[in-house]
């Protein structure tokens, strides 16, 4: 059977100080990500490319206009969805934007979190445990994009591999 995942984008918006990234603390009832910090993003619509999707999602979720972004990688998440749906995501860093970030959006509060906290420094943040694997690659100094796969079964990551 052909692999036909839901395609999405995930963006990590850098604060102008370069030390923090914008995250949403998902607090909407019934949300698969409820109680966890996550980057911003969403599903690709059938009339857009992935950069257009990133720009649209960040305008909708954070009220910002992206002016510079970098593709950091792509990840296949077989079985990740609430009903076991497969996801395939393009992961970006947003280096520059215009606009003022609100305190919250429909999904929950928006917070500028220190990147070192996202990478595991200090008190652990409530996040998907699997995110800690790929966030190291998102924020490292290697300019090459990564290409990973992280299978999920019943909401738990069962593996992680990547190539550059």
Show where each model-derived region lies.
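A generic fold-level signal
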Residues: 4-6, 16, 31-32, 84-86, ...
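Unchanged
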Residues: 44-67, 77-130, 137, 160-164
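Conserved N-terminal beta-strand and adjoining loop/helix that marks the start
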Residues: 1-22, 43
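Conserved Nudix-box catalytic region and its N-terminal flanking loop in Nudix hydrolases
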Residues: 20-60, 153, 158-164
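Short, active-site-adjacent segments that bind or coordinate small-molecule cofactors and metal centers
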Residues: 132-161
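Short connector loops at helix/strand junctions that flank enzyme active sites
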Residues: 6, 34, 39, 66, ...
